[in-house]
A protein has these predicted regions:
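N-terminal secretory signal peptides
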Residues: 1-33
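N-terminal export signals
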Residues: 22, 30, 35-62
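N-terminal glycine-rich phosphate/pyrophosphate-binding loop and immediately adjacent elements
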Residues: 66-209
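Active-site/ligand-binding neighborhood in enzyme catalytic cores
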Residues: 177, 184, 208-329, 337-339, ...
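C-terminal segments that line or cap access tunnels to active or ligand-binding sites in enzymes
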Residues: 289-296, 358-360, 367-494
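A glycine-rich dinucleotide-binding beta-alpha-beta segment and adjacent secondary-structure elements
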Residues: 476-527
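C-terminal lid/capping helical subdomain adjacent to the catalytic/cofactor pocket in oxidative enzymes
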Residues: 507-559
Length: 559
C-alpha cells in the first residue's frame, strides 16, 4: 500500500501512552460498555479493527456467501450503468452480463480494481494536492496500499479467484519470531513474539494454578475438574512438576533457548530465563498476542501471487474489452421514471461533458466522493450519503537493499507490532531467500496518527517510517533504498479508506443507503456489515443485483 532523523515528538509519545492507559475507560474512569467500547475502537483504530472486536465480543459473523449468483429470467434488453470498477462494481457487472443485461462501467482511474490496488515498481501515483510519487521498487516488487489479505472464510472473493484462475499463496499473519515493541518497556528493546507469548501464558498459568491449589476456585470448580484444570494449565503454560513457570526445559521449548541444541561436542543447549511477571504485565505487549486469534485473522489467510490487484485485473479480463470506460469522472447523476442519465468527463481531456444513459444504475462510488456529486435521489438516501464518515489510514511501503529480516533475524512473513505511530511492520509472505532487494510494509497507521501522517508530504511519511522502524530494526538506516506512501484521505477516488459505520449511524441511515431509490442502487464495502473487506464489497453487489433483478422482472425488463 503506499533516511534521515525524524524523532517522534513529545506530544506523540505522550498521546501514545495516554491512549494505552485510558482506552478501556471513559473520561470519568468508569469502565466502558460493549457498545461504548466498540465505538471508541472504531474512532481510534478503524472499522476493520472494530469488526475484529465485534467478532471477539460475539457480535459479528462470517461471510454470508452461499454460492454463485443465480438471476432467473430474461431482462429483455434492460441496460445497467455501473459507476466504479472496484470489486463491487465489476462483480455486479459480471453477474448482470451473465444474466443477459447490457452493462457499461464508468471508472475514474486508468485501471480496474478501485481500492483493490497494488503499487509496483515503475508505477506513478498522484494524490490530492498534487504530490506525485514514482515508485522506485525493483521489477516484480510491490506494496498493497489497500486490501492485503484474504481470510479463508471470505468465500465470495475466493470463489472468484478460483473461477478466474487467480493464483493464491499463504499470507502469514502470526510469526512467533517477529517482534513486539513498546518504547516504555524493556528499555525500548523489542522482544520476540514467542518470548512474550510463552512468558505471559506461563506466569498466568502459574498464578491460576496456585490459586486453584489454595482453594480459591472451590466454589466455581469441582475437585475433580480442578485436577483437570491443573493438568491443562501445566500443559498450556509450560509449567514444571511443581506448577511453576521457571527457567528450564519446559519453558525453553516455548520461549526459545539461550543456546539452541546443536551437534557434536558443543551441542548441549542452554535454557533461557523467563522475564518477570511484573515486567510482562507492565509492558502491555500481551495486548497484541490475540491478534491472530480474531476470526478475521485466523489461519489460513491468502494473498494473490504478484499483488492484490491481480483480482481486479482478472475481473476486467473476464468482462472483456469495451465494458469499462476508464478515466471517466462522474459529475452528475440524474434519473426519471424512464431511466438514469450520468454526466461525466474524460480526465485526460477535461472540460467537455459526456453523458451515458441506462435503464438502471448501480453506484459503487464511495459516499465520501458521492457526497460531492449532484445525485437525484430521495431525501433519506441523500442524507445517508452525507452522514457516513470515512476512516483515515496510511500505509508506507519500504524497499531495502537486502532482505535483512530474513538474513539477520530469521523472520519469514508475519507482523511485528509497536506502540510507535507506525503500529505495524509486515514482512513479505513470498519469495523467501530471493536475492537482491526486498519490500516490506513499514507502517499501517489508523486514527488520529493517520490524519497527522496524511498531512505530511509522501517523502516525510517515508522518512518517519524509516526513523521509527529503525528502533525495531537498526538495519533500516543502512539498508533503506526507497519508499512509497499512501494516505487514504488524499486518494482522489475515495477521500478516505472505508465507510466507518457506528451502531448509531447504521440504525439511522443504513436502511436508506441500501434501498433501491427509483432506478439507482448503491453497492460497495460501505453497503455491508463487513466494512473495509473485499468480501463486503462483493456481497453487497450480489445482494443489490438480486433485488434489482426482481424489480426488473416485475416491471417487464427494459424501460
Amino acid at each position: 500500500m503506499r533516511t534521515t532523523q525524524f524523532e517522534p515528538s513529545p506530544a506523540e509519545q505522550a498521546a501514545a501512552r495516554q491512549k494505552k492507559t485510558n482506552f478501556m475507560q471513559d473520561n470519568t474512569g468508569v469502565a466502558l460498555t460493549r457498545r461504548q467500547l466498540l465505538g471508541r475502537i472504531g474512532l481510534s483504530a478503524g472499522g476493520a479493527m472494530m469488526y475484529q472486536a465485534m467478532t471477539s465480543l460475539g457480535m459479528a459473523a462470517e461471510s454470508s456467501y452461499t454460492g454463485p449468483v443465480k438471476l432467473q429470467g430474461s431482462p429483455k434488453g434492460a441496460t445497467v450503468l455501473v459507476l466504479g470498477a472496484g470489486l463491487a462494481g465489476m462483480a455486479a457487472a459480471y453477474e448482470l452480463r451473465k444474466a443477459g443485461y447490457k452493462v457499461k462501467i464508468l471508472e475514474f482511474n486508468a485501471r480496474p480494481g478501485g481500492r483493490n490496488w497494488s503499487i509496483h515498481g515503475g508505477d506513478t501515483y498522484t494524490e490530492l494536492g498534487g504530490a506525485s510519487q514514482h515508485c522506485g521498487f525493483d521489477k516484480n516488487l510491490y506494496i498493497n496500499p489497500g486490501p492485503w489479505r484474504i481470510p479463508h472464510h471470505h468465500r465470495a472473493v475466493l470463489s472468484y479467484c478460483k473461477q478466474f484462475k487467480v493464483p493464491l499463496e499463504s499470507f502469514v499473519q502470526v510469526n512467533f519470531n517477529a517482534f513486539l515493541h513498546n518504547t516504555e518497556a524493556f528499555g525500548g528493546q523489542p522482544k520476540r513474539f514467542r518470548e512474550i507469548d510463552a512468558d505471559y501464558k506461563g506466569h498466568i498459568s502459574e498464578l491460576l494454578a496456585k490459586s486453584t491449589k489454595q482453594g480459591a476456585l472451590d466454589k466455581a470448580v469441582t475437585k475433580e475438574d480442578q485436577e483437570i484444570l491443573l493438568e491443562s494449565l501445566r500443559n498450556w503454560g509450560a509449567l514444571d512438576r511443581n506448577l511453576s513457570y521457571v527457567m528450564g526445559e519446559e519453558s525453553s521449548v516455548r520461549r526459545g533457548f539461550a543456546k539452541y541444541p546443536g551437534g557434536g561436542v558443543s551441542g548441549k543447549p542452554e535454557h533461557s530465563k523467563p522475564m518477570r511477571v511484573e515486567d510482562i504485565l507492565r509492558s502491555r505487549l500481551w495486548a497484541t498476542l490475540a491478534a491472530g486469534n480474531n476470526y478475521e485473522m485466523q489461519t489460513t489467510m491468502f494473498q494473490p501471487v504478484g499483488g492484490m490487484d491481480q483480482i481486479g485485473k482478472a475481473f476486467a479480463r473476464e468482462l472483456g474489452p469495451g465494458v469499462i470506460e476508464y478515466n471517466a469522472r462522474v459529475t452528475e447523476i440524474d434519473q426519471d421514471e424512464r431511466g438514469v442519465t450520468v454526466t461525466y468527463e474524460d480526465t485526460t481531456a477535461p472540460g467537455k461533458a459526456k453523458t451515458a444513459k441506462a435503464d438502471w444504475c448501480v453506484c459503487t462510488i464511495p459516499f465520501s466522493v458521492l457526497s460531492r456529486i449532484p445525485v437525484k435521489v430521495g431525501a433519506e438516501m441523500a442524507e445517508a450519503i452525507t452522514k457516513l464518515p470515512y476512516a483515515a489510514s496510511v500505509k508506507v511501503g519500504l524497499q531495502f537493499k537486502r532482505r535483512f529480516w530474513e538474513e539477520d533475524e530469521a523472520i519469514y512473513g508475519g507482523i511485528s507490532y509497536t506502540n510507535l505511530p507506525i503500529t505495524t511492520i509486515s514482512y513479505p509472505s513470498t519469495d523467501y531467500h530471493s536475492p537482491g532487494k526486498g519490500v516490506l510494509l513499514g507502517a499501517y497507521i489508523w486514527g488520529l496518527n493517520a490524519f497527522d501522517y496524511t498531512s505530511h508530504t509522501p517523502e516525510e511519511r517515508v522518512r518517519k517510517a524509516v526513523e521509527y522502524g529503525s528502533q525495531i530494526h537498526p538495519q533500516y538506516k543502512q539498508e533503506f533504498d526507497n519508499g512509497v506512501s499512501v494516505g487514504w484521505h488524499r486518494v482522489p477516488w475515495t477521500h478516505g479508506c472505508f465507510g466507518q459505520w457506528t451502531e448509531q449511524l447504521r440504525e439511522r441511515y443504513y436502511g436508506a443507503a441500501t434501498q433501491i431509490d427509483g432506478r439507482i442502487a448503491m453497492a460497495g464495502e460501505h453497503i455491508s456489515y463487513i466494512p473495509a473487506w473485499q468480501e463486503g464489497a462483493i456481497l453487497s453487489a450480489h445482494d443489490v443485483i438480486g433485488r434489482l433483478h426482481k424489480k426488473v422482472m416485475a416491471t417487464g425488463g427494459a424501460a
